[in-house]
Every structure is written in structure tokens, then in C-alpha cells.
Amino acid sequence: MIETFNFQGISDRVAASYLQAHGSITWHQIKAQIGRDPACSLLRSYWAYEDCRYDKTRQACSHPRYLRGCPVPSHPLRNGRLNQTAFSFFLFVRDVAGSDLFRWLDDQLAAAADLGNSAAQEALVGPMRHVFGVSDKVLTMTLSAVLMADRRGRPDWFDVGSRMIVVDRLVHNLLVRTGILAGFDATHGYGQHCYGQAGCADILRRVSAKIDARQFDAGFPANFPRYIQHALWHYCAADGLNVCNGNNIDDRKSCEQISCIVYSICGRNALKIK
């Protein structure tokens, strides 16, 4: 999961290239470095680790007297925030999940089993929301991948993960440009509204329920919101099909890409009002 956290705030291609060149960070590395009684009080527990403010460029933090011997800067991650995220997540798993993340996931899902899929998702994302430097979007994306990794062995995990939807700016903008948000009378700016009632995620779930995903792969579940959302992202992303994005469309004008497969039925709404 820590490696996946690197894929935020930058293109996937750049993030992957950096990881390949410099490597990531592992549980065992952090465990060996923190030890039983770290000099910096912030590293003593998950709840104490806040306001670290480690800055890779300036080589500074909120407790400079301990910086030279601190393990946080010792890993060559892309920026200091990612170093903080790695240690914050380690402390979460150690102190909140009892060093057994899979068992914690099982327990959280079991506690929410009778409350519906949304409650199950919140049972996982909610407690992790306070891990430093990770947004709901990144948590949802990462947890979805983990939960869907073993469909045969953990079908209950797969059911929750397959219904997790990640709304990034590309997907939101596609729903604006195509006129889908306007068609649902759900126009809103990118952000938390995307996950609210009649927001992007809600609309994608409604759309997914009408698409039998088994037509794309017989092994898929009939209703597969995560796949539908990812397909839309892939259509837009520069690292994907690179069609519906600001590289190819002037945000102030209607789309002019007549080669787009949905051009004839697209609302072609300008993203920005002049």
C-alpha cells in the first residue's frame, strides 16, 4: 500500500519511473529503524505522530534537534510528505491494526456486514483518513486494489472493493464535458461534492448498475462500478487512451475531437465559462 501512495500529485508514469530508479520503503525497514524507544517523541505512537513537517528540500522538521538521527529522512522517496506518509501508515498498522492489517480489514468488514456496502467502505476508509498525506481518493484506490486481489479466497473483500469508486479530476471533467452531470441536474465543482448525494460517484454507480460488465470479461461480476470508473479514467488519462483531457481540448470551448467515439452523442460542454 505504501508504494501505491506514491502515485498522487504527479503522473503515474513519472511516479513509476522514480520508484524504479530510487526504490520504495518497506515495513521491515521502518520497524528496524524505529525500535522500542525512538528519540523523537513523535515516532512513539500513531497518535503522537503529527506536525512532523519534514521537508526534504530544506532538510528541516519540527524537531530539528533529532533530525540527524531521525529515520524519517533516511529513505529517498520523491518528497518529504511521502516519507511522513510511510511512517504514519506504519504506525497506524502497528498501533491501530495490531501489526496485522489483514485481520483488521476482516474485523472492520465483519462489524459493518449488515449495514450495506457504503458502511463497509467507510469502516475501512474512515479510520485510515487520519494517516498523514493520504486523501479519500488515494485510500479508496489503494484499498480497492487490495480487496480485489483474491476474489476466490476472499469473495466478501472483492464485493466491497469492486464497488469502490475513485473520482479524480479527469473523471469529473469527463462527466462535465459530456453533459452527464447537467443531465442529472447534478452540476458541481470537483471535490467532496463528487462523493455526495447525486455526485459523480453516485451517478457512476447508477450507470454501472445498467451495464453488464460480463460482456467485457466473463469472469467479471455483472455490476462492477470500479471497472466502469477505471475505464472512463483510462479513456481520459495521458497514460491511457489520452482522449478526453485538457491536453486535447481547450477548456474554454466545446470539444472538437470528431474522432472521439462518443462525439455524436456528447454534450461537448466547455469546462470553463468564458
Give the location of each predicted region.
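HhH-family (HhH-GPD) DNA N-glycosylase catalytic core used in base-excision repair
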Residues: 1-274
